[in-house]
C-alpha cells in the first residue's frame, strides 16, 4: 500500500511539473501569420492575420493572463488591429484560453520549444492552424482597438 501511494504521488508531481514547464515556456511574445478565415467575437473576419500572443504568468504557475492581437488585412486596403485580453491555464496537455468576453479557445496538438509555437486553436467551432515564432523585439502598439 505504501509503494502504491508513493507511485501516485510521484505521477501527480511529474504531471504538475510538466504543466508548469509548459506555462513557463509560453512566457513572452509570440507572433506569426494565421492563414484561415474565421469570425472573431468582435466581428472581424478575413483570410490572413498577423497575430501576436503575449503570455504572462508567475514562476511555478500553470497559467496566467495575456492578450492576443490580430492584425487583419482586408484585400490590402486597410489594416485593422483588434486586441483581446485573456486568462490561460495549462492542464492535461491542453492550453485553455478564456477571453474577456467569455469565449474560450483550446490549443491542442502543439509543439512548443524556445523559438517556435505551433499547433491548433479550437475556437468557435473551427480548428485554426497556427505557427508562431518567439518575438522578443515586439513592442506594444498603443493604438490597438481594445487597449484603452
Where are these regions (language model features)?
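Acidic, glycine-rich flexible loop segments
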Residues: 90-116
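Edge beta-strand at a domain terminus
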Residues: 54, 80-92, 116-148
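Beta-turn initiation residues at beta-strand->coil junctions
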Residues: 34-36, 68-73, 98-101, 120-124
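N-terminal helix-cap/turn-to-beta initiation motif at the start of protein domains
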Residues: 16-33
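N-terminal glycine/threonine-rich, aromatic-flanked beta-hairpin/loop signature
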Residues: 43-94
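Bacterial N-terminal signal peptides that target proteins for export
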Residues: 1-3
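Start-of-domain marker
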Residues: 28, 34-35, 39, 46, ...
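C-terminal motif of bacterial Sec signal peptides marking the signal peptidase cleavage site
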Residues: 11-15
